[in-house]
């Protein structure tokens, strides 16, 4: 088994991080981000990894290849503002997927509106406080290390003073949903049905 080490991800890792997220579709194909393609993911992570409130831990093998990552924003409101500030570049990156599948435009628009703290905004993700985001690992590598990686990320957050974190999990993502309930002992706050019919637990 190859040696795996953990470190904080940097903006220069955006391409590899996006590639790992893209390969999640080998196990789970749902989600607007996967629908928008790898080019969009690269543009997104280039922005996210440069956000001062982002904590992203990645796992790296002895060849320097990133095998997985887990990330959390310590300020979901600031992150939403940052994403909206880059809406043009993200829109351009998503354009190819939207041209191929015009129905995606409605989903993208709803997701964009959900970034607002307005009472009328769609409730799809948490938009305030500390928000857990993605936890991804390449399919053919030592996935047990992914749990260690996630725990390290959470320990860093704890050391930084975080005592409460919100996140969302689609019920269809059965293994992750059960892990958070039974192992992480996460407490469901709300269950919603997304416009595309997916059931999401927050």
Predicted regions and their residues:
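A short beta-loop-alpha structural element at the N-terminal edge
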Residues: 4-20, 74
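Conserved GNAT-fold acetyl-CoA-binding loop/helix
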Residues: 27-44, 84
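A short helix-loop-beta-strand connector motif used in the catalytic cores of GNAT acetyltransferases and
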Residues: 43-58, 74-82
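Conserved beta-strand in the GNAT
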Residues: 58, 65-74, 131
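Conserved acyl-donor/pantetheine-binding loop and adjacent beta-alpha core of acyl/acetyltransferases
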Residues: 78-134
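Conserved GNAT acetyl-CoA-binding A-motif
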Residues: 127-132, 157-171
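Conserved acetyl-CoA-binding loop-helix of GNAT-fold acetyltransferases
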Residues: 129, 133, 137, 141-158, ...
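Conserved active-site alpha-helix within GNAT-family acetyltransferase domains
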Residues: 152, 171-190
């Amino acid at each position: 088994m190859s040696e795996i080490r953990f470190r904080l991800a940097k903006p220069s890792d955006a391409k590899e991080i996006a590639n790992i997220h893209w390969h999640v579709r080998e196990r789970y194909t749902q989600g607007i981000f996967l629908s928008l393609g790898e080019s969009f993911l690269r543009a997104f992570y280039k922005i996210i990894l440069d956000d001062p409130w982002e904590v992203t831990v990645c796992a790296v093998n002895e060849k320097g290849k990133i095998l997985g990552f887990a990330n959390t924003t310590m300020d979901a409101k600031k992150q939403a503002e940052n994403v909206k500030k880059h809406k043009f570049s993200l829109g351009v990156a998503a354009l190819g997927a939207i041209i191929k599948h015009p129905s995606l435009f409605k989903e993208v628009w709803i997701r964009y509106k959900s970034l607002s703290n307005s009472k009328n905004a769609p409730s799809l993700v948490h938009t305030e406080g500390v928000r857990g985001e993605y936890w991804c690992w390449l399919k053919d590598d030592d996935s047990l290390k992914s749990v260690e990686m996630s725990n390290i990320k959470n320990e860093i957050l704890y050391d930084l003073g975080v005592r409460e974190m919100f996140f969302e999990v689609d019920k269809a993502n059965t293994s992750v949903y059960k892990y958070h309930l039974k192992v992480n002992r996460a407490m469901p706050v709300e269950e919603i049905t997304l416009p595309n019919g997916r059931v999401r637990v927050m």
